[in-house]
A protein has these predicted regions:
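Short acidic alpha-helical/loop segments enriched in Asp/Glu that coordinate divalent cations
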Residues: 13, 26-34, 45-63, 142-147
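Charged alpha-helical initiation segments
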Residues: 1-29
Length: 148
């Protein structure tokens, strides 16, 4: 499956995000917001189908709190830190991507709005497009849905 499909809210949000990021009149803050909305649209039915107010942050926390509830098609990541071999399960890799995308320093901790850095916002859009593809491809799913 592709990240964009016709007549789909997530596709519309993704297309709007790309236009806002790279169009003639860029607005990278809004581009990042639309990219996040695309993910929320696809992630909500999987993670929080009964929560009408689910956000990327709340759904990331839900995944983080119960990682054993999920099967994820992403490969486990094995890495070396100071000679010590560590591993991260595929679901944790997805959680890290969602946390990276969802973190918006311009929205937290200050009464003064901060400008959105163009390179950062575009990087979020690139990663968000990948996550949209993962979600469309069924990368995360509940263990219960596998057993049925």
């Amino acid at each position: 499956m592709l990240p964009a499909q016709p007549d789909d809210q997530a596709s519309q949000c993704t297309q709007e995000a790309w236009t806002l990021a790279f169009g003639r009149n860029p607005n990278v803050g809004d581009a990042r917001g639309r990219a996040i909305k695309a993910i929320e649209t696809l992630l909500k039915p999987i993670v929080s189908p009964k929560n009408n107010k689910a956000t990327i942050g709340s759904m990331t926390n839900e995944l983080r709190q119960a990682p054993d509830k999920w099967e994820c098609k992403l490969a486990d990541r094995v890495y070396n830190v100071n000679g010590e071999i560590n591993s991260k399960r595929g679901i944790e890799v997805l959680i890290d991507a969602l946390a990276t995308i969802g973190y918006q320093p311009d929205r937290h901790g200050s009464d003064q709005p901060q400008d959105v850095d163009e390179a950062t916002a575009r990087s979020v859009l690139f990663l968000a497009t990948t996550v949209v593809g993962w979600l469309r491809d069924g990368t995360p799913r509940t263990i219960d849905s596998i057993e049925k």
